[in-house]
């Protein structure tokens, strides 16, 4: 999307950048395949507390518009020195989404394997390891005695942690490590399961649509401790 910066400011405490994209019949890069006029606005706010991100879609068409949000977020590993083996990732996953040979959901959910159960408890090494490309439902995990919705990467040797916190609109995850031999892994929060508009059961897939003039927003936080 060719976003344009619509607002930017800097203070002693934070930096904010707002960017927007409008899709309509006169700007048909997306409209020709998705014939709904809409506005997408993303706000980034950076401070000593971390990075906050908010994305909002507004339906500017005359019909209900399907809307699903997902972010392809790479987390650098290692990020604070050490070796890949020092780091584990935890993610608030519930069940595993069964995928077909095209990596599309079959509609079935599976219990977490022994490998992926480590995402909930203890952590899983996700770089310098085997390929991972898997989908999951969202279910909160316990972090420091509190329920947590999101992903985190921890250096087990130093205790340094990076948190990627999501809101309650995130209902699914895709986790991808690009073959396992690169210095990053992507915990990708999604408001609906991959291919949700074509799912047999839209309700459990997270599919949603918004009426003309309505908006749909999601918020995320990225910070270190």
Regions from the PLM with identified roles:
Residues 1-48:
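Extended, loop-rich substrate-binding clefts of extracytoplasmic carbohydrate-active enzymes
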Residues 55, 208-224:
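Short Pro-Gly-centered flexible turn/kink motifs
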Residues 55-61, 177-178, 224:
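Asparagine-centered strand-capping/turn motif at beta-strand->loop junctions
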Residues 68-76:
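Histidine-centered catalytic micro-motifs
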Residues 77, 81-167:
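Active-site/ligand-binding surface loops and adjacent short beta/alpha elements
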Residues 154-194:
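Glycine-rich active-site loops that engage anionic ligands at enzyme catalytic sites
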Residues 186-187, 192-209:
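A conserved acidic, glycine/proline-rich C-terminal tail/linker
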């Amino acid at each position: 999307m060719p976003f344009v910066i619509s607002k930017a400011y800097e203070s002693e405490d934070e930096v904010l950048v707002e960017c927007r994209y409008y899709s309509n019949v006169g700007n048909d890069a997306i409209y020709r395949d998705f014939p709904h006029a809409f506005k997408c606005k993303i706000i980034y706010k950076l401070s000593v507390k971390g990075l906050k991100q908010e994305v909002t879609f507004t339906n500017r068409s005359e019909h209900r518009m399907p809307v699903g949000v997902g972010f392809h977020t790479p987390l650098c590993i290692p990020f604070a020195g050490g070796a890949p083996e020092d780091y584990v990732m935890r993610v608030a996953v519930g069940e595993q989404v069964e995928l077909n040979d095209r990596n599309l959901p079959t509609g079935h959910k599976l219990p977490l394997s022994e490998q992926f159960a480590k995402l909930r408890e203890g952590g899983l090494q996700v770089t310098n390891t085997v390929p991972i490309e898997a989908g999951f439902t969202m279910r909160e995990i316990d972090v420091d005695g509190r329920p947590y919705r999101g992903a985190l990467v921890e250096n087990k040797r130093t205790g340094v942690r990076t948190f990627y916190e999501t809101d309650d609109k995130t209902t699914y995850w895709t986790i991808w490590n690009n073959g396992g031999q690169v210095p990053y892994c992507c915990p990708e929060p999604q408001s609906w399961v991959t291919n949700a508009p074509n799912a047999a059961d839209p309700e459990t897939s997270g599919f949603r649509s918004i009426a003309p003039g309505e908006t749909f927003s999601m918020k995320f936080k990225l910070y270190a401790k």
